[in-house]
């Protein structure tokens, strides 16, 4: 919004030539990060007090770890604050004419609404049931599908590079120009929606300990910021993406501003969500943030790399699937409890140890993901 409103003024008033800085994505990304962080820090104390006053507290599962019983009543739905602190800076600093930005923010907001309904029902009923899974999944598929289809229908209005590679998959550590996976449009769109929905639910499953989910979300957003900028960056006629032999998508660079907003809001929230947490994000936060990460993977053509980058989320999801299948087929459990972070709790690991070690793994996976751009 600021870009569209103020940048044109420099052409009419010479003394406003300094507004030229708004052209640059790195500047607007930094400003979005700072704005999101400041918003979260300023609003969080009041927001947490209001959650306490309205008795919007965490409902703990009866079959959960014993150590979680003390968490009952801790303010939840803090993800609503993350959404506000994420979406407002994105609207302020990003180029809202960019379809990728519009689609990503729409999914973030839409998944946030689904998460809000889920949290609301949990609190109202005083149990961990929430919104029935089938309704949640239908909502995610419809919103994700609409956003993905929107960008594909507009392919002719986007730079030619997007129309050319939109249904191709980049294989990590493999030169994109030589060995892309070409999918038919009717196959790719459902696959892209699956990536978005799966990432959203994976982040939701990871959000079981204080700061466990938001840490990797920040790390993933920081990595996507770099990837989006490189994919969309072009200096004169030199394209860094072409040099690295990864997909080049000029419009994707604007997603860096969105990533900056996620990082800023995430850091601000982590200040209050770190162990012992003063507030939980709830499904309103985890589903929204996961949906946003899924859209980033699709629009930067890192659908397959997201398995490595979001390895923590992937492992958490696989642990749940493995546990359910094993119990149904054999009557035995592979883990003491799923998702896997609860398994380590049951083994006696201290909560901060689990959290920090998962963060470390997430950082290492982010470094591997970035290295994949050059190691081809």
Swiss-Prot record:
GO terms for molecular function: metal ion binding; phospho-N-acetylmuramoyl-pentapeptide-transferase activity; UDP-N-acetylmuramoyl-L-alanyl-D-glutamyl-meso-2,6-diaminopimelyl-D-alanyl-D-alanine:undecaprenyl-phosphate transferase activity. It is an enzyme of class 2 (transferase). Its EC number is 2.7.8.13. It catalyses: UDP-N-acetyl-alpha-D-muramoyl-L-alanyl-gamma-D-glutamyl-meso-2,6-diaminopimeloyl-D-alanyl-D-alanine + di-trans,octa-cis-undecaprenyl phosphate = di-trans,octa-cis-undecaprenyl diphospho-N-acetyl-alpha-D-muramoyl-L-alanyl-D-glutamyl-meso-2,6-diaminopimeloyl-D-alanyl-D-alanine + UMP. Keywords: Cell cycle, Cell division, Cell inner membrane, Cell membrane, Cell shape, Cell wall biogenesis/degradation, Magnesium, Membrane, Metal-binding, Peptidoglycan synthesis, Transferase, Transmembrane, Transmembrane helix. It is a multi-pass membrane protein. Pathway: Cell wall biogenesis; peptidoglycan biosynthesis. InterPro entries: Glycosyl_transferase_4, PNAcMuramoyl-5peptid_Trfase, PNAcMuramoyl-5peptid_Trfase_CS. It is found in: Cell inner membrane. One of its GO terms (cellular component) is plasma membrane. The chain crosses the membrane at residues 28-48, 76-96, 100-120, 135-155, 179-199, 211-231, 252-272, 279-299, 307-327, 353-373. PANTHER family: PHOSPHO-N-ACETYLMURAMOYL-PENTAPEPTIDE-TRANSFERASE (PTHR22926), PHOSPHO-N-ACETYLMURAMOYL-PENTAPEPTIDE-TRANSFERASE HOMOLOG (PTHR22926:SF5). Belongs to the glycosyltransferase 4 family. MraY subfamily. Catalyzes the initial step of the lipid cycle reactions in the biosynthesis of the cell wall peptidoglycan: transfers peptidoglycan precursor phospho-MurNAc-pentapeptide from UDP-MurNAc-pentapeptide onto the lipid carrier undecaprenyl phosphate, yielding undecaprenyl-pyrophosphoryl-MurNAc-pentapeptide, known as lipid I. This is Phospho-N-acetylmuramoyl-pentapeptide-transferase.
